[in-house]
């Protein structure tokens, strides 16, 4: 994604200058301030992308194969996997093309590289937006299944889920195209940051409310069976730990990238902010790490999906 403070990698690859050796250490920025810069080796970047790609392809394949998984909940999980797949794939493609251009193995005119960069940017941005949207959609789906359990199947129907999925994809592509076209406007970056914060607040409110309801339900059961009070306390701690991990991973993986965008608006020339800008590739790597973790949290915990996945893997041998 083209952002101030980070070089557009494909266009920069047309220069014959060799890239710097990846390192973790202190580097001086233009003002002489010492910065902690974490460079992500291209090999590590490609490896993370490949792991994410394989994981999410397996999720999509398993859900597509098993008709028992053709429900609204798994529809959202499948689309989340597809979004994460595109995030990883687009970043892998950009890195691979960059390496080929730097090595001289791929000859291309600047105009062609510019168009390719724009296409990759749109794919990356739209898949990031859709990934955040589907994380929110999964939270809403789970909330309805708990608080409106008796009416769940009449509220969350497959046709409605498909319409929601279509709306998310169309909106993601449309807005990402606008964001890429007007990326140098502060309002565009602020919109992205506000969108991230809105998704974070939505997920936090819904999951905290769900945890409170679950603890209340467990407490009611414990009152009927006084001996199970310790089990109730353990359930509350386990639920709080799960919620902390879920929201913590989301914030840790996505937060630095959107902090980067926020600082571009607030302090584009400040020495401290310039130090943070140098770690842009690290922030992208964290998003790819989130794409690796998502299947573990939302997909592979399903026994039905794991069983289907085993069948798919056994059939492929």
Swiss-Prot record:
GO terms for cellular component: plasma membrane. One of its GO terms (biological process) is adenylate cyclase-activating G protein-coupled receptor signaling pathway. It is a multi-pass membrane protein. Gene3D superfamilies: Rhodopsin 7-helix transmembrane proteins. Residues 64-72, 141-163, 212-240, 301-317 are cytoplasmic. It is found in: Cell membrane. Residues 1-37, 94-118, 184-191, 267-279 are extracellular. Keywords: Cell membrane, G-protein coupled receptor, Glycoprotein, Lipoprotein, Membrane, Palmitate, Receptor, Transducer, Transmembrane, Transmembrane helix. SUPFAM superfamilies: Family A G protein-coupled receptor-like (SSF81321). It holds the Pfam family 7tm_1. Its main location: membrane. The keyword Glycoprotein applies. One of its GO terms (molecular function) is melanocyte-stimulating hormone receptor activity. A lipid is attached at residue 315 (S-palmitoyl cysteine). Glycans are attached at residue 29. The chain crosses the membrane at residues 38-63, 73-93, 119-140, 164-183, 192-211, 241-266, 280-300. PROSITE patterns: G_PROTEIN_RECEP_F1_1, G_PROTEIN_RECEP_F1_2. InterPro entries: GPCR_Rhodpsn, GPCR_Rhodpsn_7TM, Melcrt_ACTH_rcpt, MSH_rcpt. It comes from the Eukaryota. Interacts with MGRN1, but does not undergo MGRN1-mediated ubiquitination; this interaction competes with GNAS-binding and thus inhibits agonist-induced cAMP production. Interacts with OPN3; the interaction results in a decrease in MC1R-mediated cAMP signaling and ultimately a decrease in melanin production in melanocytes. Receptor for MSH (alpha, beta and gamma) and ACTH. The activity of this receptor is mediated by G proteins which activate adenylate cyclase. Mediates melanogenesis, the production of eumelanin (black/brown) and phaeomelanin (red/yellow), via regulation of cAMP signaling in melanocytes. Belongs to the G-protein coupled receptor 1 family. PANTHER family: G-PROTEIN COUPLED RECEPTOR (PTHR22750). This is Melanocyte-stimulating hormone receptor. It comes from Mandrillus sphinx (Mandrill). The gene is MC1R.
């Amino acid at each position: 994604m083209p952002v101030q403070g980070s070089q557009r990698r494909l266009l920069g690859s047309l220069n014959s200058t060799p890239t710097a050796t990846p390192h973790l250490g202190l580097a001086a920025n233009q003002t002489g301030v010492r910065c902690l810069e974490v460079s992500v080796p291209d090999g590590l970047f490609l490896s993370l992308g490949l792991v994410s790609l394989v994981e999410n392809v397996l999720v999509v394949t398993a859900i597509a194969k098993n008709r028992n998984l053709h429900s609204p909940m798994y529809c959202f999980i499948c689309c989340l996997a597809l979004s994460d797949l595109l995030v990883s794939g687009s970043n892998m493609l950009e890195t691979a093309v960059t390496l080929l251009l730097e090595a001289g193995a791929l000859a291309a005119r600047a105009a062609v590289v510019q168009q390719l960069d724009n296409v990759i940017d749109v794919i990356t941005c739209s898949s990031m937006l859709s990934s955040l949207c589907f994380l929110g959609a999964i939270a809403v789906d789970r909330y309805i299944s708990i608080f409106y359990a008796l009416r769940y199947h009449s509220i969350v129907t497959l046709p409605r889920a498909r319409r929601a999925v279509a709306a998310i994809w169309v909106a993601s592509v449309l807005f990402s195209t606008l964001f890429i076209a007007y990326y140098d406007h502060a309002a565009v970056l602020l919109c992205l940051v506000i969108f991230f914060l809105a998704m974070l607040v939505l997920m936090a409110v819904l999951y905290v409310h769900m945890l409170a309801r679950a603890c209340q339900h467990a407490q009611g059961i414990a009152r009927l069976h006084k001996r199970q009070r310790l089990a109730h306390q353990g359930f509350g701690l386990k639920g709080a730990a799960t919620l902390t991990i879920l929201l913590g991973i989301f914030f840790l993986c996505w937060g630095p990238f959107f902090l980067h965008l926020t600082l571009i608006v607030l302090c584009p020339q400040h020495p401290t902010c310039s130090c943070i800008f140098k770690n842009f590739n690290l922030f992208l790597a964290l998003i790819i790490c989130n794409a690796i973790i998502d299947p573990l949290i939302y997909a592979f915990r399903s026994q039905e999906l794991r069983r289907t996945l085993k069948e798919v893997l056994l059939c492929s041998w």
